[in-house]
């Protein structure tokens, strides 16, 4: 069996289902969006545009991309090449991209995934929402769109229900977006004048790390530097501050780049075969298990006999089934994952 042809067939099957059931994202203002796609690479081509929803769906059904992206920006000339200056950008969605690396608990290479790094990505998404977006930015849960990225991350879109506020946010300049990113990453944190948001966050972190450290003098004090320098525990406090600043792994380019592309919601991720899945809110996010909930269930009913001859030792668990380099039978879900990670194998039959 031709492996690449079979993979393409599976992607086409999924997109037929997604379009028939109206779950594939139709980006707002579709005629003003740039699209990109890839097969063996993330982006083989971009500067693609569609006049309407029908043209968009027809293209997806015909091409069944393994990686599929839309621009966050709205453009007058989305199909023009030559960078942002050529595209006539007049508006841009605001989204954060959490993209974690492997954790200390992970036993795999950095390009692999497991329950530990997926759990860390989830925890970081919850932390971003509960520690920044709601208390510091004044947003409600209903103002956010939470999307599993299809790999080790989450996309958090800022979508205020108040149209006037949304108009303001989606008109932010690159400098405005950079300020938000720097605030969350603590890059503009000044210990001589700590604002209420970071004060609350750091006090909570200190108490969680070491209950022996008294935070009473810090709770109503802006000038933390002055107080900390006179404490015996100052080195430990400075370490906790740095750890707290580095608690979220955000892809800064998603905020910086005017013409950044983000994966189309309910497309498939070409490295994993997992669904780029939207979640209804924090409750679903807390329950969410990508290794089960981001899998196209029809793929679990397709089983292939394989010969895996890759030298690397690996293991992946999908929908409760474990696969490794000794596996002789794999589901279509596992097939897409192994193919996306360049594991060497041949299909014998299905």
Curated annotation (Swiss-Prot):
Q: Which InterPro entries match?
A: DNA_primase_S, DNA_primase_ssu_euk/arc, DNA_primase_ssu_PriS
> Which CDD domains is this protein grouped with?
AE_Prim_S
Task: Provide a GO biological process annotation.
Answer: DNA replication, synthesis of primer
Active-site residue numbers: 97, 99, 251
Is Metal-binding found in the keyword set? yes
Q: How does it assemble?
A: Heterodimer of a small subunit (PriS) and a large subunit (PriL).
> What protein am I looking at?
DNA primase small subunit PriS
Gene that encodes it: priS
């Amino acid at each position: 069996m031709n492996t690449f042809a079979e993979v393409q067939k599976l992607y086409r099957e999924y997109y037929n289902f997604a379009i028939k059931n109206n779950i594939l994202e139709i980006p707002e203002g579709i005629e003003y969006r740039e699209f990109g796609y890839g097969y063996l690479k993330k982006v083989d081509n971009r500067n693609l545009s569609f006049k309407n929803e029908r043209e968009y769906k027809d293209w997806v059904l015909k091409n069944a991309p393994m990686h599929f992206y839309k621009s966050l920006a709205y453009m007058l000339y989305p199909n023009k090449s030559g960078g942002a200056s050529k595209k006539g950008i007049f508006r841009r969605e605001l989204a954060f991209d959490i993209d974690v690396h492997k954790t200390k608990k992970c036993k795999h290479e950095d390009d692999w995934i497991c329950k530990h790094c997926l759990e860390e990505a989830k925890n970081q998404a919850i932390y971003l929402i509960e520690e920044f977006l709601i208390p510091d930015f004044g947003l409600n849960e209903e103002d956010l769109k939470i999307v599993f990225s299809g790999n080790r991350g989450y996309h958090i879109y800022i979508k205020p229900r108040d149209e006037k506020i949304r108009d303001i946010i989606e008109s932010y300049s690159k400098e405005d977006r950079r300020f938000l990113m720097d605030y969350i990453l603590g890059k503009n944190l000044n210990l001589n004048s700590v604002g209420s948001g970071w004060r609350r966050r750091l006090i909570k972190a200190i108490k969680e790390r070491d209950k022996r450290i008294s935070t009473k003098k810090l709770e109503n004090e802006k000038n933390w530097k002055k107080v900390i320098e006179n404490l015996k525990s100052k080195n430990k406090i400075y370490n906790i501050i740095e750890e707290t600043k580095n608690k979220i792994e955000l892809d800064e380019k998603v905020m910086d780049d005017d013409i950044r592309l983000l994966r189309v919601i309910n497309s498939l991720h070409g490295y994993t075969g997992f669904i780029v899945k939207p979640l209804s809110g924090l409750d679903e996010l807390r329950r969410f298990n990508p290794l089960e909930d981001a899998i196209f269930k029809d793929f679990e009913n397709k089983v292939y006999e394989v010969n895996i001859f890759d030298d690397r030792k690996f293991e992946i668990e999908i929908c409760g089934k474990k696969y490794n380099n000794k596996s002789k039978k794999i589901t279509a879900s596992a097939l897409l994952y192994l193919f996306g990670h360049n594991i060497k194998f041949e299909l014998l039959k299905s």
